Amino acid sequence: MPRVACILNPNARDGLSVKQWGQFEPALRLAGFEVELHNTQYPGHATEIAHSLSSGDHEIVVAVGGDGTVHEVASGLRGSNKVLGILPIGSGNDYARAHGIPTPKGNKFPDMQGAVDILVSGVDRRVGAFRVEGPPAKGHKSIPDPEHHSVDGEPEVSGNMVRWSFLEIDSGVTSAVNRMKNEGKFKWIRGQLKYTALGIRAIFGWRNQPGWIKIDDEPGQIFNFSGLFCMSQCQTFGGGFKVTPGAYPTQGHGSLLMAFGLSKLQMLMVMGPLEKGTHVGKWGKISMRNATRLEVRAVGGDGEPSNDSHNPTMFVNVDGEAVLTTPISMAYHEDQISIRGAASIPNE
């Protein structure tokens, strides 16, 4: 009987993950798996558990949760030959979506059996990841300081922190929204309405500031950072927003979206097109291209790129967590992890 190790975040979706796990577990056993469950207890715990399992005899290590849990488990397995499976019961589930795995609809999971079937007979794909380095974001009374994980490797610059991205890296209005959410702003509002309220607050509170960007081996350029940028290996993030339309995990590079110099009205107006994937080219200010390396810095008083962080702080999301700030660097590395997904995946 094949053994499967499942790593569950019991706090995902305010505890709904535990209830849905109660449906998944018997389905896994019925499929012929010997199930071993590991519950996480604190941020980064899933990475530690996954790393300890990376050389074990389990057929597959399964992340049970959303994109945050997937990120932690993938970080722990990265560089090994152990296969990562996904049972998506978080709020975003974009990495599962990119691998053709069925996802929940609200609080219901109509094709839960389909997700289990992929664990049994899905296709294993070897994919890359981005190494991301920058200063760690400072904590908040409701957010602990991000911690260094030895499995991520050491930074090249003293005081920096390293994370690996399997889904996407973004900054701008999107990371400001995520940071405010984590700080507990509008916590009495639930669902998509909360993100709408956070987005409006972030946009109207946005202060224009320049930024310097260097893509691959091209000369650096200065932009007005009113908007966002996103380096992604998948088509969607934020729970289905098609931010980098056409991207897929086995493409062998990142898809870089840049939306700079937007007015506050344009930032509000772009949210609908972002969800549908019809935003590229709008107002002549939104572009998308392939890239494998990116540097982002503030601009000093002399008009040159600076080693200082932006002021006010520009947070950088790595797979949905606002853990870093500028100056930031990222580089794509091939052959980092094996993912079990559907026989065919979107855009491949």
Language model features: what each stretch is:
Residues 1-61, 71, 113-117, 346-348:
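ATP/NTP phosphate-donor binding region
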Residues 10, 134-136, 169-173, 233-235, ...:
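Glycine-rich beta-alpha junction loops
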Residues 10, 64-66, 87-91:
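Glycine-rich beta-strand-to-loop/alpha-helix junction loops that act as flexible
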Residues 17, 215-222, 242-348:
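ATP/nucleoside-binding phosphotransfer catalytic cores, i.e., glycine-rich phosphate-binding loops
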Residues 31, 79-83, 87-228:
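Catalytic core of DAGKc-family lipid kinases
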Residues 69-82:
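Short Gly/Thr/Asp-enriched flexible loops that form oxyanion-binding sites at enzyme active sites
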Residues 170, 174, 228-244, 322:
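Glycine-rich phosphate/pyrophosphate-binding beta-alpha loops
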